[in-house]
Amino acid sequence: MAGGEPQSLEEAFAARRNVLAARRARERLRRLIASKSRHRFLRYLSWRFWKFERRDYWRKPKGNDNKMRLQLKGYPPIVKVGYRTPKAIRGMHPSGLEPVIVSSAKDLERLSPERHIVYIASGVGLRKKQEIRRAALERGFRVAN
């Protein structure tokens, strides 16, 4: 038999079960990523002043009597540790794959298409970018950019 083929029927079934288990695990991850709501933390008084509203970045309220800092009812939530993304899905692509930045076609050799999604580095030129994209698609990788 060839090198990659299973020796018996039991091994074939075991290999199939492993593939299905991995697929189910990735589906669970994908659902967990989708269900994780992303809070949009507002800057204090951004609902009142247009100049704060259009600047969409977080600033911690620090005033002595600031109602938002005191977490009073009717004021938006402030950034806290409890809002952090679960460790299992932190930094993952919404597809459930782990993102990897690639700067040459050689980098693809150490990666697995079942686990990784490819981002081509921003410093790569057009010709090399096309070469990396072609190599990635031949090996079955998904290219995100």
Curated annotation (Swiss-Prot):
Coiled-coil residue windows: none
Signal sequence interval, chain numbering: none
Keyword annotations of the record: Ribonucleoprotein, Ribosomal protein
GO BP annotations listed: translation
PROSITE patterns cross-referenced by the UniProt entry: RIBOSOMAL_L32E
NCBIfam families named among the record's database cross-references: PRK08562.1
This protein's name: Large ribosomal subunit protein eL32
Organism: Aeropyrum pernix (strain ATCC 700893 / DSM 11879 / JCM 9820 / NBRC 100138 / K1)
